[in-house]
Regions:
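The catalytic "switch" region of P-loop NTPases
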Residues: 2-7, 171-284
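P-loop NTPase nucleotide-binding core
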Residues: 46, 50-188, 192, 198-201, ...
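Amphipathic alpha-helical "lid/sensor" segments that cap RecA-like P-loop NTPase cores
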Residues: 265-333
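Short alpha-helical segments that sit at the start of domains
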Residues: 328-350
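Short acidic, hydrophobic short linear motifs in intrinsically disordered regions
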Residues: 359-371
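Short amphipathic alpha-helical interaction segments
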Residues: 373-389, 402
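Short, cationic-aromatic polyanion-contact patches
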Residues: 397-415
């Protein structure tokens, strides 16, 4: 006996409001559901196609669709003869030059194997040993010393001092890229994600990490990097390594509606019956205003609210699209309870005081010192709580201006 499917009430197989990144290797979240961003997509592809190597950056607020855009660009490049893999390379906040170089080498190695499973030869052997050693050691600096001989098959694993990867890695990376180009690849495209993880504590250190491997690893012919993050446009040091970032603006409301329609169609349960939208258009319009471009937050709000409301519906009932009043009431109660539980009394009261001024307002720490009548360290601590709870986000700094903070759609729904 099949289990109940709430979304079947609308002739849908599952929730159309998933927040997972679209991927080329996923049937559940395929790239064919991608909508909009044609100008940005073409700009990124043109830069790749016009250069022997490239370093591009995509910036924008959290949840706006940066990662999915780059996944789509990778698929486009793959179709044009470039090699890539479906993996997204994370950048660690506590990484070092060696670790970042190792991640790049691993990404190129994975791309080679994904596109040429029978790859062999000294270049591949050398990369394989280095990558395996890095992964077995959890990214540590125990690497292989490569023996001399035909095919490079003679090797001995030895523990090397810190910095060994910086000595061997660039050569192995260069040779592996040449191998790929010699096998017909027009280049290799890698996706580095979440530059904010590298930059949030110290922008100059982030730039030092990137500059530290730029000449050794980032400039090789055939290597095309696209780095994604929320902060790349605000740090000139990082921009000295990558091109001027492509800053994404929110999808227009019409594109969001198109995105939802594509998902409804893709998830149609019974082809003999039409699907029905689970939510009325005014609901999407209202949430679009509240979340101000945060598509991930908008989709999560729709999924949370509609799932809760559908749970009260009898199986087999003729269900109309969820209306605005019902959804807002459900989300207000849900978000309010969750935030109060996470924040505690003091931080919650300060969030309410901010909302009473204007929930859509941007505030600096100096303004919040005056609003909350507390000292700056207390404001900083409260903001950290609010950010961790998903109630507030810090906007990218503009030059030397003070950082501005904004209440998220999740918090605005609760207040």
């Amino acid at each position: 006996m099949p289990l109940p499917n709430l979304w079947g009430l609308y002739n849908l197989r599952s929730s159309p409001f998933f927040q997972a990144t679209l991927r080329a290797d996923s049937d559940a979240t395929p790239l064919r559901l991608f909508v909009g961003r044609q100008r940005e997509r073409q700009l990124l592809l043109t830069t790749i196609g016009s250069s022997a190597s490239s370093r591009q950056a995509v910036a924008g607020r959290p949840g706006i669709g940066k990662t999915t855009l780059v996944q789509t660009v990778k698929a486009d490049a793959q179709a044009a003869g470039y090699w890539s893999s479906n993996e997204i390379i994370p950048i660690s906040a506590d990484g070092a030059n060696e670790q970042l170089l190792g991640q790049l080498l691993s990404g190129v190695y994975d791309a080679v194997l994904a596109n040429c499973p029978t790859a062999a030869g000294p270049e591949v052997e050398a990369a394989q040993q280095l990558v395996r050693s890095l992964r077995l050691r959890g990214g540590g600096l125990t690497v292989s010393a490569f023996g001399v001989g035909i095919g490079g098959s003679q090797s001995e694993s030895v523990a090397t001092p810190p910095g060994a990867l910086l000595l061997d890695g660039p050569r192995v990376l260069r040779d592996l890229l040449r191998y790929a180009l010699g096998r017909g690849a027009r280049g290799i495209v890698l996706h580095l994600n979440n530059l904010e993880n590298l930059s949030e504590a110290d922008a100059s250190r982030a730039a030092d990490l990137l500059r530290g491997i730029r000449d050794q690893a980032l400039l090789h012919d055939g290597l095309h990097l696209i780095v994604v993050g929320t902060v790349v446009q605000s740090h000139t040091q990082i921009r000295s390594v990558f091109s001027d970032p492509l800053v994404l603006e929110p999808l227009e409301l019409a594109a969001v509606m198109q995105l939802l329609a594509h998902r409804y169609e893709a998830l149609q349960l019974d082809p003999a019956r039409p699907w029905r939208p689970p939510v009325a258009e005014p609901v999407v319009q209202k949430l679009y205003e509240l979340f101000r471009g945060d598509l991930r937050g908008l989709l999560k709000a729709l999924e949370d609210g509609i799932t809760a409301l559908l749970g009260l519906t009898s199986a087999g009932a003729d269900v109309a699209p969820v209306g605005l009043d019902d959804l807002l009431l459900t989300l207000r109660q849900r978000n309010q309870a969750e935030l109060q539980d996470q924040l505690g009394e003091s931080a919650w009261e300060r969030l309410v005081a901010w909302a009473q001024v204007d929930p859509a307002s941007m505030q600096t720490q100096a303004q919040l010192v005056a609003l909350w009548a507390v000292k700056q360290p207390s404001v900083s601590q409260t903001l950290q709580q609010l950010i961790e709870a998903g109630a507030v986000e810090a906007l990218p700094r503009r030059g030397r201006e003070a950082i501005r903070y904004l209440m998220t759609g999740t918090a605005r729904l609760a207040l």
